[in-house]
Amino acid sequence: MSSKVEQLRAQLNERILVLDGGMGTMIQSYRLNEADFRGERFADWPCDLKGNNDLLVLSKPEVIAAIHNAYFEAGADIIETNTFNSTTIAMADYQMESLSAEINFAAAKLARACADEWTARTPEKPRYVAGVLGPTNRTASISPDVNDPAFRNITFDGLVAAYRESTKALVEGGADLILIETVFDTLNAKAAVFAVKTEFEALGVELPIMISGTITDASGRTLSGQTTEAFYNSLRHAEALTFGLNCALGPDELRQYVQELSRIAECYVTAHPNAGLPNAFGEYDLDADTMAKQIREWAQAGFLNIVGGCCGTTPQHIAAMSRAVEGLAPRKLPEIPVACRLSGLEPLNIGEDSLFVNVGERTNVTGSAKFKRLIKEEKYSEALDVARQQVENGAQIIDINMDEGMLDAEAAMVRFLNLIAGEPDIARVPIMIDSSKWDVIEKGLKCIQGKGIVNSISMKEGVDAFIHHAKLLRRYGAAVVVMAFDEQGQADTRARKIEICRRAYKILTEEVGFPPEDIIFDPNIFAVATGIEEHNNYAQDFIGACEDIKRELPHALISGGVSNVSFSFRGNDPVREAIHAVFLYYAIRNGMDMGIVNAGQLAIYDDLPAELRDAVEDVILNRRDDGTERLLELAEKYRGSKTDDTANAQQAEWRSWEVNKRLEYSLVKGITEFIEQDTEEARQQATRPIEVIEGPLMDGMNVVGDLFGEGKMFLPQVVKSARVMKQAVAYLEPFIEASKEQGKTNGKMVIATVKGDVHDIGKNIVGVVLQCNNYEIVDLGVMVPAEKILRTAKEVNADLIGLSGLITPSLDEMVNVAKEMERQGFTIPLLIGGATTSKAHTAVKIEQNYSGPTVYVQNASRTVGVVAALLSDTQRDDFVARTRKEYETVRIQHGRKKPRTPPVTLEAARDNDFAFDWQAYTPPVAHRLGVQEVEASIETLRNYIDWTPFFMTWSLAGKYPRILEDEVVGVEAQRLFKDANDMLDKLSAEKTLNPRGVVGLFPANRVGDDIEIYRDETRTHVINVSHHLRQQTEKTGFANYCLADFVAPKLSGKADYIGAFAVTGGLEEDALADAFEAQHDDYNKIMVKALADRLAEAFAEYLHERVRKVYWGYAPNENLSNEELIRENYQGIRPAPGYPACPEHTEKATIWELLEVEKHTGMKLTESFAMWPGASVSGWYFSHPDSKYYAVAQIQRDQVEDYARRKGMSVTEVERWLAPNLGYDAD
C-alpha cells in the first residue's frame, strides 16, 4: 500500500471527506458555443461537438481547471476527472473513439496539477484525484430492442476493452483513485471492475477503487432492476475502498438508500446526490444551505465517510456541505456477519442462521428431458416458463446447464441468460452457471449482473488450472462450487471427501485469496440402493463429510445434486421424493447448506408414510444389510401414487366453513362466485335481512379496511372486495325494501367532479375505498355544477362534500363551490382532491372562502383517516384546529415566498429567446398536408402502452415492469396486470371500445410569440393563429423559451410547418363504465376507465410516430422500442394545451377548429375546455431537432396584457385561465 493510500485511509478514519460537485452544471454556466468546443484543433471535425464536455480538457482546458480550482477552494478533498463520457464507447457519438486515451490522460493530468497546487498551499489538507469511469451509453444487461429481449448492443468484452484503455490513461495521467460512478447497469460496472483489476495487474500498480451506483426512482432500484443490497452484493468482490450512491435523486429521496448502504457495507460509504429533483425546466432548485442542512443530518446519523454533489450542485453547495460536516465524526466501519452474499435483482445472503437453500434443477439439459427438448427446438419462451415455475415453487437459486452434445452450449447459455435478464420474476434470484466446459462458464459470467455461483471447478486437471480458474472467478465476482475431485478421481469415501476439500480450501484461501464464505463444497452425492454393496454407505459418507467440512473449514458452504441419491428409483417419483426428504433431513442436520433439487417436488419428512420413511432411513443410514431389498419390495406399493393428494381438498376447504367465515373469506379474497348463495344462507339464519349487512358483511369489510390500512392489501384488491360487497347488498336490497329497514352507516358523503371537468377515475376510487369502510357515497358523476352539488347535499342530509378535478380551470370552480357553501350557510366539511389540487392551493384559495372545515386529501389511501377524524365526536375539534393552524402556516409561507429565480420583463425574455441559425437550416417538408381521420385497433395500441401510470392509478407505486416483482406490491401488480390484459383482449375481440382520432399538418411560420397557420403553400391566407407564452424568469445560461421559437420566423423566408392532433381511447368509455356500475362492479368500472386513458396516451404515442415516419416523414428510418418512445428518444415534441409548455386551455379551441375535431371523432370540449371523453389527448406537433419540453412557469402582468391583446380577450379573463401561472396577485 502506497503512502498516499495510507494517508487517505487515515484521513477517512479521522473525518468526513468532501468530494466535488457537478461538472456539467458548471460547464453550462460558461455558456460555451460550438466554436468553444471545437477550438482550433477540431475546427473542421465532421460532426457537431457542442455537448461533448469531456473534449474541453483538450479544447478549453482553462475552463475545466477553473472548475476544479473552484471546488478545491470550496473545500473539496477529492476532485473527479472530467472523463464521465471518455470511453471509446461513449466517444463514438462524436466519432472520437481514437481520442479516448488522450482525453483521459489529459483530464487526469489537468486534475493532478490542480490538486498538487492546492496540496502545496495547504499541506495539512492533501488533495486527491479520482479518475472517473462513467457508465457509457450502453447497457450490457438490458436489450435496446423491445422485440428481441436477448439482443445486446454491447458485450462484456467490449466494455472491458474500453474501460482498460481509459483506466491505463487515467493512471498514467496521475489519478490517485479510480471512481466507477453513476452505475445504472451493474453488469457494466462488473466489466469495469474486471478491466480495472486486469489493467492494474498489467501496469504493476494497485490504486483504491471507488464505486457509486444510481437508484433511478422511488422503486429503490437501479435502472437494471437491482435493489441497493443486491447491487452491493454484486460488486463486493471489487474490495472497493468506498461504495456509494449518486445522481438521479436529491437528498430527501436518496436518504433511505444511503442509510441502507451504510448498514451493509464493510467499506467506507460515499454519497453525492443531486441538488433535489429537476424542475419542469430540467433545472435543480435545491439551494446550498438547505442541501447542506440535510447532509449534516446524514452525517450526524452516522451514514457518511465521503460526501459531495452531483447534478445541479455548484461550488456554493460544496462549500456549504464542507462547513456542515466539519467536526462531525465519520461513519465507523461496521462488523458485518460472515455470509455468502449472492444476488439476482434481489439479495440472497446465506449465513450460519440461514435455512436450507433450494437450487432449482429443472433448467438443466442433462437432467430434464423437457428442458433439453425446448432448448434444442429453440422454444425459449417455454424454457423460461420452466425457470419461472422453479422460482414460483420456491427455488432461491436456479441452476442452468446447457452441456449437450448436439447444442452450441455457449450460444444457448448466452441467449437463455439474456432472456432471463428481461424476466424480473426469474431474474430476482441468483443464477448458478453449471457446466463442465470453462468457455461456457465464462460466457455465462459475462451475462449476469448479479453475483452468481459457478458449478463447478475441481483439481482433476491439476492445481495450476484450478488456481487459474479460481482467480478468474474471483475477478468476475462469483461464488464457486468446488467438487471433491482431484487428480486421482472423485472422492467416494468420507475420508477422501474431507481430504480433497481440505486441500482445495487451503489453496483457495491462502494462494488465491478467495473468501471462504464464497466457497461451496460438493462432496459428491452418489446413488444408493443400486444392489452393489460398495455403494451402500454413499449417503452416510456424504452426511459424515458435511460434519467434517463444517468442523474443519470455517465459513465454507456445502451443496450437492440431491436427485443423484435416488437415481436407482427413476420412474417412481413418490419413492424418489421420500429418499430426497430423508437424505436432506440428515444432511441438513449435519451442515448441508443448499442442494440442487426440483423445487416443486420436495416432500416433507414428517409427512411421509411411516413404513416408507423407515425403509428409506434404513438405506440412507445403511442400518440394515437387507435395506435395499426391503425398499425395492415396498417401492411398488407407492409407484404412481401421490404423497400429497390433499391439494385440491385444501384449496376448497374454505367452502366447508360456517357461512359468516365464508362471507369474510369471499370479501377479503374478492371472490364473487358464491356470494349470492352464501348471502342467502346468511339471510336464512338472520332475524332480519339488514343484519347480514351489519353483521358478517361489515365484519368482513372491517377486515378489508384493517388490512388496507396496515398496507397488507392494495387498492385493486380493495376494489374487488367492494365488488363482492355491492353484489351481496344488491341481492339483499329487495328483502330490505320489503321490510322497510335501513342499515346504519358511518356517515354520508356527496362526491363530484366539478363543472367543466370530465375526469373521474380518482373520484371513483375514493368512493370505493370509503364504501369499503361503511360510508354511504352519493356520487354525482362529472361536470357537476355547484348548484347541483349543494342541492343534493341538502336533500340527502350529507355529512361531507368531496370535490375532484384534473384540469387547472377546475381549481377556480372549487373556489366557487366553497363560496357558495359559505353563502348558503353550510358548515359540513369540504374535502378537496385531484391531480391539479394541492395543499397550498386549498389553503390559499379555497379555505379562506369557507368557514367550515376544508381539507386537502392527497390520495385515496388517506381519505378514510381524514373522514373518520372529521366525523368523530372526540377527534373532530382537534383535527380541524390542527389543519387550520397548518393551513395558516402554509399561507404565511406562501406570502413570504420569493420566486426561485427573479422575473424579467417580457422584452428581456424575448431578447433571450431560443437562438438558432435559421439560414443554415431547412425545415423538413410535410409529406401529407391537410386533415385526416385516423383509427387504430386496440391490438396495435397495446404495444405502445406506458403501464407505469396505470399502476399509479391504482395506488401501486413502482415503475413497470419492475413493479411486477416488487417485494411489497408485486403479487397484486401481477394480478392487476393480468386483469387489464384480459379486459383489453375482450374489448378488442368484441370491438366495444374503439379508439379514434384526427391529425392535420399545415404550412406555418412564427410571428413574434404566435404561429400563423396557412391554408396552403402559398402562405397568403391565414386560417388560424396559435398563441403561445414565453418563460419569464431569469435564465442565466439558458434561453427563455416559447413554443413559437421552434417554428421558422416569417421574416426568415423559410417554409415551415406545424401539426395538430386529437385522439380518444373511445367514445364508448362512459357507457361501458356505466354498464359495470349497473352490475355493482366498481372494479371493472375503474378498470375500463383506466385502460381507456392508457389507450388514449398510447394512441398519441403511436400517431406521433406515424407523423414522424410517414405523414410529416422527417424520420422515416426511426426504429425505437416502446421504452425509448416512453422516454421520448426521438426528434420533435407534441406539447398539449393545459400542460407546462402551453398552460392556457382555451388554445384547444384552435385545434378543434383546425381539425374539425367533433365532426371527425365525436370528441367535444366542455365550457372549461376539458376534453370529452375523459380518455382523450390533443396537442401540437413540432419537428425542430432542438425542440424540447419545458415549463412556462410564472409570468408577469406585462405578458398577460400582451397575450390578452393578441387573443382578443380581456386581461381579467386571461388571468382567470392562467391563474396558476401568475407571478403576481391578480386580486
Swiss-Prot record:
Write down the PROSITE patterns for this protein, in alphabetical order: ADOMET_ACTIVATION, B12_BINDING, B12_BINDING_NTER, HCY, PTERIN_BINDING
Domain B12-binding N-terminal as annotated: residue spans: 650-744
**Domain B12-binding per the UniProt entry, residue ranges:** 746-881
What does it catalyze?
Answer: (6S)-5-methyl-5,6,7,8-tetrahydrofolate + L-homocysteine = (6S)-5,6,7,8-tetrahydrofolate + L-methionine
GO terms under biological process = homocysteine metabolic process; methionine biosynthetic process; methylation; tetrahydrofolate interconversion; tetrahydrofolate metabolic process
Where does the record place the AdoMet activation domain?
A: 897-1227
Pathway involvement of the protein, from the record: Amino-acid biosynthesis; L-methionine biosynthesis via de novo pathway; L-methionine from L-homocysteine (MetH route): step 1/1
Q: Which residues bind Zn(2+)?
A: C247, C310, C311
Which enzyme type, at the first EC level?
A: transferase
- Domain Hcy-binding, chain residue ranges per copy: 2-325
EC number per UniProt: 2.1.1.13
Residues that hold S-adenosyl-L-methionine according to the record: D946, R1134, Y1189, Y1190
Q: What else is known?
A: L-homocysteine is bound via the zinc atom.
Family membership noted in the UniProt record: Belongs to the vitamin-B12 dependent methionine synthase family.
Q: State its role.
A: Catalyzes the transfer of a methyl group from methyl-cobalamin to homocysteine, yielding enzyme-bound cob(I)alamin and methionine. Subsequently, remethylates the cofactor using methyltetrahydrofolate.
Domain commentary: Modular enzyme with four functionally distinct domains. The isolated Hcy-binding domain catalyzes methyl transfer from free methylcobalamin to homocysteine. The Hcy-binding domain in association with the pterin-binding domain catalyzes the methylation of cob(I)alamin by methyltetrahydrofolate and the methylation of homocysteine. The B12-binding domain binds the cofactor. The AdoMet activation domain binds S-adenosyl-L-methionine. Under aerobic conditions cob(I)alamin can be converted to inactive cob(II)alamin.
Quote the protein name from its UniProt record: Methionine synthase
**Which organism's genome codes for this protein?**
Escherichia coli (strain K12)
Q: Which gene encodes it?
A: metH
